[in-house]
């Protein structure tokens, strides 16, 4: 988690009272309050200061209350529940002076909450973020699932700013138009494209890319971390331009090309290919594993030839299938 120091100025601010850094600034005028969710925990004491040189006739309101919640230049809020979070605004004479938004990051039994995102159930450990790269250019896409539909905000970025870390720039998250169904429940899918700032595709990776995704839902804050080498998230795009050339009997020669997105030169960034004859009524057809972009195989009417690709030298994920009919 990136904790940012609070700067004392005439701007609206939160005064850090907890020695455990339980309150920190997420962005301008937005603060995360880390709250112990166990029964009997006292919550966190937050002091808000109005951005004004005036001292008198100041009142405070909250977007969670229809009544005035305090008066004076400072306001003390004991934050324990989500009803204590929200946007606090100071006013004088009908004029808005400044505001601060408080978000809760809850911790229960020593574990930070992970309520916003769906666990995608990696066999070894919890997986909330999944990432894939179509080549070694340093560009990749990450995605996640959530059952939440409204009042969401996501930000994906490098989790470390040290000079020896791999810096990454990510775009804005976008919502897929299609739902993803898991265990008979529909989820929204968000994705974001990222690019490593400095990359050398032919160099061996010695440090992983480390990312943190910050999620906000209404007044709730959570973060999710992931780390990987580009080589471990490679999934080539499918081969393109599949063509069949009839030979004698039912034998055909199938040829294809490398996907446009794959790294070049192909003599260095080689792919291997899995070729399969597929028929709906047959569980398993003839198949071949080849290094070059062509193969001879038997395929009769009603079947199709399918081809998928994998990094030749590293056990990457296989691409999706590309196919051509044998008719």
Swiss-Prot record:
Entry-listed glycosylation sites? 125, 135, 223, 315
Q: Please list the residue ranges annotated as the Ig-like C2-type domain.
A: 23-106
Q: Which PROSITE patterns match?
A: FN3, HEMATOPO_REC_L_F3, IG_LIKE
Q: Name one Pfam family in it.
A: IL12p40_C
Major localization class: secreted
SMART domains for the chain: IGc2 (SM00408)
Which superkingdom?
Eukaryota
Disulphide bond pairs: 50-90
Q: Which GO terms describe its cellular component?
A: extracellular space; membrane
Gene name per UniProt: IL12B
Tell me what this protein is called: Interleukin-12 subunit beta
Localisation per UniProt entry:
Secreted
Organism lineage reads as: Eukaryota, Metazoa, Chordata, Craniata, Vertebrata
Q: Which family does it belong to?
A: Belongs to the IL-12B family.
Subunit notes for this chain? Heterodimer with IL12A; disulfide-linked. The heterodimer is known as interleukin IL-12. Heterodimer with IL23A; disulfide-linked. The heterodimer is known as interleukin IL-23. Also secreted as a monomer. Interacts with NBR1; this interaction promotes IL-12 secretion.
Return the InterPro entries for the record: FN3_dom (IPR003961), FN3_sf (IPR036116), Hematopoietin_rcpt_L_F3_CS (IPR003530), Ig-like_dom (IPR007110), Ig-like_dom_sf (IPR036179), Ig-like_fold (IPR013783), Ig_sub2 (IPR003598), IL-12 (IPR050676)
Function, in words? Cytokine that can act as a growth factor for activated T and NK cells, enhance the lytic activity of NK/lymphokine-activated killer cells, and stimulate the production of IFN-gamma by resting PBMC.
Q: Which residues form the Fibronectin type-III domain?
A: 238-327
């Amino acid at each position: 988690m990136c904790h940012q120091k609070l700067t004392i100025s005439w701007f609206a601010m939160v005064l850090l009272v907890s020695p455990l850094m339980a309150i920190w600034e997420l962005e301008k005028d937005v603060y995360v309050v880390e709250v112990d969710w166990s029964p009997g925990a006292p919550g966190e004491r937050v002091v808000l200061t109005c951005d004004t040189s005036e001292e008198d006739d100041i009142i405070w309101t909250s977007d969670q209350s229809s009544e005035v919640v305090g008066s004076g230049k400072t306001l003390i809020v004991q934050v324990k529940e989500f009803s204590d979070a929200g946007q606090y605004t100071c006013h004088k004479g009908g004029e808005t002076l400044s505001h601060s938004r408080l978000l809760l990051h809850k911790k229960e039994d020593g574990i930070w909450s992970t309520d916003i995102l769906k666990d995608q159930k990696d066999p070894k450990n919890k997986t909330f973020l999944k990432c894939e790269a179509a080549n070694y250019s340093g560009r990749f896409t990450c995605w996640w699932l959530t059952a939440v539909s409204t009042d969401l905000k996501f930000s994906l970025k490098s989790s470390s700013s040290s000079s020896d870390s791999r810096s990454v720039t990510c775009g804005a998250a976008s919502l897929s138009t299609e739902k993803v169904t898991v265990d008979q429940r529909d989820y929204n899918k968000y994705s974001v494209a990222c690019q490593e700032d400095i990359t050398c595709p032919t160099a061996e990776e010695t440090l992983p890319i480390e990312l943190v995704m910050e999620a906000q839902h209404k007044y709730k804050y959570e973060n999710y971390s992931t780390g990987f080498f580009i080589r471990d998230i490679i999934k080539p795009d499918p081969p393109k331009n599949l063509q069949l050339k009839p030979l004698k009997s039912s034998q055909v020669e199938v040829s294809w090309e490398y996907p446009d997105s794959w790294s070049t030169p192909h003599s260095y960034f080689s792919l291997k290919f899995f070729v399969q004859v597929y028929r709906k009524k047959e569980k398993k057809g003839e198949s071949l594993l080849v290094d070059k972009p062509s193969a001879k195989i038997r395929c009769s009417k009603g079947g199709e030839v399918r081809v998928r690709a994998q990094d030749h030298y590293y056990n990457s994920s296989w691409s999706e299938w590309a196919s051509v009919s044998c008719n």
